[in-house]
Amino acid sequence: MKDIKNLKIAYIGGGSRGWARNLINDLAKEPLLAGEVALYDIDLEGARMNEKIGNDLSAREDIAGKWNYKVYEKIDDALTGADFVVISILPGTFDEMESDVHTPEKYGIYQPVGDSTGPGGIVRALRCLPMFEEFAIAIKNNCPNAWVINFTNPMTMCVRTLYKVFPEIKAFGCCHEVFGTQKLLAKVLKDTYDLDVPREDIIVNIVGINHFTFLTEAKYKGMDLFPIYKKYVDEHPEGIGEPIDPDHWANAPFMCTHKVKFDLFKRYGAIAAAGDRHLVEFCPGKWYLKDIDTIRSFGFTLTSVQWRKNDLVNRKKVTLDNYNGKPFELRETGEETVLQIKALLGLGNIVTNVNIPNKGQIENLPIDAVVETNAFFSGDSLKPVHAGKVEPALNALFERIVEEQETVCDAALTGDYEKAFVAFVNNPNVCLGFEDARNLFNEMLENTKKYLPHYDRYLKQLN
């Protein structure tokens, strides 16, 4: 059994101003665990800041979790002997993401997020997956028995790559989108019965692909929530919450009225369990992303990359303030990473949604495709919870997504960008003629070529 007071957590992306701060926060609040957090990042300055912030926090008398944060300049050194590995990286910079998201707009293609599917998600994967190939090899060589926790998008393809490269890896992907839908169901209960229900008390069965997940069951203390949800949907044809002011549309980057979820429920009889911004990118483009008027009518927003750049400036300021001595303020992150780590160490059990290879938990999707369902965490064990069959109409969408993701994974790892173009031109949001699709694809690759290891080979093929 592992020494829970002498653990090693390796963090790939340890200079993060987001996910890393969440982990620093949650480890500080947990009294049972201690050890070293090994920070590795190509952004060495960011990693060194997190090193000092984490150690300053651990030194405080009011902090329960005592950890030593240490920067490593080489990934092999960071991973050596690790019990857990956390991965949260930005593949490239926001300049590359700006191309992913906004270059397609010249062709009338709108993407609220652009990191999981669609033209942006596909090109992002071509940059990201070779990095994950390297991570998988490094994990195999330095800590093959470690549990690996991924937060990076495109989530499904990142996890799939880890298993393709190192089949024995013990990896899973975490996403908090389902939590938001549990909170929505809690609101439905509040509005309907004046009940105050923690989202954790709503028991759900989850099926799908990350960012395109659905609930096929939802219960609270044995009460079936589907009839209640159906009535609520019927009573709120325009969604819920305040309509987004068109004059301040760009200042509400994550808002939605859940109208897309409600519409998908009418189509499929299942409760969509991700943010509307993510859901729409997996659907045929004319449904929700036809044009700006359609987008506004469904009550969600497009998250501009300029907003992300501005947000990063703010995050860097907060980090710098903490680095210079301003006390780190603990908060409720809503994340379950530390609970998962504790369960894997044998300190209790937990059931929650994760992204792992399909071993039959979704009966009618391909074996080994990475799917999102519930899983049972216990001592050094992660077992998927059987989720059953997906109804044919919804499964048709899932099967297309799986096929696209498998194609893109193969293309990224072999450097066959022509194969990636096949997935690109087949994507339901790329509603373009062949020549326009080719021109868009080539322009997007050109804009991010610095991070594409096989770009020169692709150019030779074109010529």
Model-derived regions, located:
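Long, compositionally biased stretches enriched for glycine and/or charged residues
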Residues: 193-463
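Glycine-rich phosphate-binding loop and adjoining beta1-alpha1-beta2 segment
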Residues: 29-64
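Redox-cofactor binding/interface segments in oxidoreductases and associated redox assembly factors
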Residues: 80, 86-87, 150
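Conserved NAD(P)H cofactor-binding loop of Rossmann-fold oxidoreductase domains
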Residues: 89-92
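Rossmann-fold NAD(P)-binding glycine/threonine-rich loop
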Residues: 95-165
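Internal, well-ordered domain-core segments that constitute the primary functional module
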Residues: 135-223
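N-terminal Rossmann-like dinucleotide-binding module
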Residues: 7-37
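Short acidic low-complexity segments
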Residues: 68-81
